[in-house]
Amino acid sequence: TANLMFDSWRRTGIFPEENSYYLPQEYDHITQCTLYYNDKELVEIVGQMPPDEKMVVFVKSRRDMERYRKFFGDEAAYFCSSNNAGGAMDPIEKCVNDCVLQKRILVTTVALYNGIDIEDPALKHIVIELWDPTDIRQAIGRKRPINKKDTCQLYFRSLPKQYITTTREKTEYWLEPGQARIKFEAGRESIWQEFLKKPTADDQIKEEVTLTYSPTTGSYTADKMAIALLRDKDQKLRKMEKLGYEKFMEEELWSSMGLTAKKVRFKKLEDYLENVQGQMMQKEELRAQIMEAGQIAPPTGRCKNRPLGQIVLNREIRQYGYEIKDRTDWGRNSPTRGKTFWVVTKLQ
């Protein structure tokens, strides 16, 4: 937000360049950056967390918070704005008090940004389910390390393309009335009149995301700062649609922070692969065991009725140093002679 304001002020000459100062952001306290993909993986990450360590989970909406409350229950605190459609959840003093987390887990929205600092050495895990790099930097900045030993790990939830597309479409839905009104204010009244013919125009206007209503004049004006913010988000979402979540984050965030994101690993799966290495197993059994130990979600969409194949499973387990191969049983007296099985083998 601040960068957009500063850029606008520089363009208009309000903000002289000689009054501009750059303060570099430091991320030396971040020791690891991990990617995960679904709720089950996050629950497993929490399960692997040492009992004396704490976690903050930044989510996109109250709906996400309600979903995680089913997993974490009273073990976590839940904080969102009181202006939320569903109202407030836990009061801030039951979430963060005197800069210290009050429970082992805090699930929160971007409402935590507003001047709330966390100076708690036990906070070792920050989970990010947001997508905008500006919001993410703000979220990470809530932790204020008290010394060089006060470090933490980051976890990013990879977002599917469908979510990115839906978010872009919603952003453009909010943006449309403001952009039409700007053109109206510049003398192009026909653009505004054309927008008013849309069946969704009344709803878009009533939301007042990019418009401000004046009771005095009985008319709307374009909210130029809101429009600038949404244009910025729209550009980012279009780039993310094109590159994919992980490549976008690498270009827009991780590289500038000196981070390399790695896929989440689970010791349970690591131990399982080591134990079954070399054994001929039924495809169905091995598939089910790997999915359970690795918290791998079943396929969705058009592929939801198809079992995960060898290619997909190998993509998941190669980071552990293993892969699945076909092997036919040619044992002379074997009751399964001639049948093909799956075998977990160690990568060379």
Region locations from a protein language model:
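A short beta-strand-to-loop transition that corresponds to the Sensor-1 phosphate-sensing loop
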Residues: 1-5, 59-62, 107-112, 158
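Conserved two-lobed SF2 helicase motor
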Residues: 99-115
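Conserved strand-helix element at the start of the C-terminal RecA-like helicase core
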Residues: 45-72
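A short beta-strand element within the Helicase C-terminal
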Residues: 107, 116-130, 152-154
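Interdomain hinge/linker at the junction between the two RecA-like core domains of SF2 helicases
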Residues: 2-48
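Conserved SF2 helicase motif VI
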Residues: 129-154
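The feature captures the C-terminal accessory region of ATP-dependent helicases
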Residues: 172-348
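Conserved helicase motor
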Residues: 60-63, 77-92, 109-113
